[in-house]
Structures are given as structure tokens and as C-alpha cells.
């Protein structure tokens, strides 16, 4: 039996979703981490980049723990994100600008 998996990170407007698939495309586990919405102007929405980053790490950790697998068993990673989104990270500190 092949014990390798595909990890998908879906970074949406309201939450970070992480889904683990087996090689047959079946969902093994899923995790959802909601993040706070900020509305500085009508029709605008902003997010805390640090919160998103932490949500991604926590969701991945939870998926690996719940599925009882290691990162070594992840054979592929897919990432989807919000359209029309920009985020800048400081090269020296690794922190969001």
C-alpha cells in the first residue's frame, strides 16, 4: 500500500483550509482555520498576514497529527489563494510588511 499523500492549502478570504488526499484522490483529512476580517473602507477587506501564516502552519500540523503521518509522506503540495491579493514579506526578517 502506498502511504504518500497530496496536501492542498486553500487560502480563502475567510479561512485557511488544508485538505489531505490519498493517491486515489480521496479526502483523508481536512482542517479549517478561520481568520479575522478587517474592513478599513466600504467594499475592502484586509487580513493579518501573521495570523494567516500561523493558521497555515497550525492546520498542516493538525492534518499530519490527525492522519498519523509525517511530512516525508507528502509527495505533492498544491496551493490556491484569493484572487486580487498581494502580500509582501521582508526578506531579512521573514515578517509581513
Give, region by region, the residue ranges found by the protein language model:
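N-terminal glycine/serine-rich phosphate-binding loop of ATP-dependent small-molecule kinases
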Residues: 1-97
Amino acid at each position: 500500500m502506498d502511504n504518500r499523500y497530496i496536501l492542498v492549502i486553500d487560502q480563502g478570504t475567510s479561512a485557511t483550509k488544508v485538505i489531505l488526499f490519498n493517491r486515489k484522490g480521496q479526502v483523508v483529512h481536512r482542517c479549517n482555520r478561520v481568520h479575522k476580517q478587517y474592513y478599513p473602507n466600504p467594499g475592502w477587506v484586509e487580513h493579518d498576514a501573521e495570523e494567516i501564516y500561523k493558521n497555515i502552519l497550525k492546520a498542516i500540523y493538525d492534518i499530519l497529527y490527525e492522519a498519523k503521518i509525517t511530512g516525508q509522506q507528502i509527495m505533492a503540495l498544491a496551493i490556491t489563494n484569493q484572487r486580487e491579493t498581494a502580500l509582501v514579506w521582508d526578506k531579512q526578517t521573514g515578517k509581513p510588511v
